Amino acid sequence: MKNFSMLVSHVLVPPAIEAIMRSPGNRVQAFLAAGHVCSVMGTWQYPPVAARFRVPIVVTGFEPLDLLEGIRRAVVQLETGRHEVENAYPRVVSELGNEAAQGVIAEVFEPVDRAWRGIGVIPARGWRLAAA
């Protein structure tokens, strides 16, 4: 095939949240987890992160009402001293995610060190195309 290339820049989000929370001068008080990522990967990886760093994580979609609901839920958690994972996007996201898609990801990609702009390199937390 001529004149064909692919830019693969897939990453795992929970390790990035951990890196942000460990960074000096961090002032992040809550996270909105991207619904499109969680629709594939699920929410099951987030509770240990929320507990370890005592930070609310709310899964949300990208529609204005979805975002506002995610922000509202994060604020309620902050006001009540909670630090849990909430799924504000249940019409798309489940705890386990899309297991068929996860199987394809495991088949097609392999873990790689990935640089995140503003964070640095996170070891073995990105994906690249696996050798054929």
Protein language model annotation of sequence segments:
Residues M1-S5:
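A short alpha->loop->secondary-structure connector
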Residues E69-A132:
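Internal helical hairpin/lid segments
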Residues L7-S9, N26-E95:
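A conserved active-site cap/scaffold subdomain adjacent to cofactor or substrate pockets
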Residues L7, V11-P14, E18-R22:
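Active-site loop-to-helix "anion-binding N-cap" substructures in soluble metabolic enzymes
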Residues A16, R27, Q45-P48, A100, ...:
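Exposed alpha-helical structural elements
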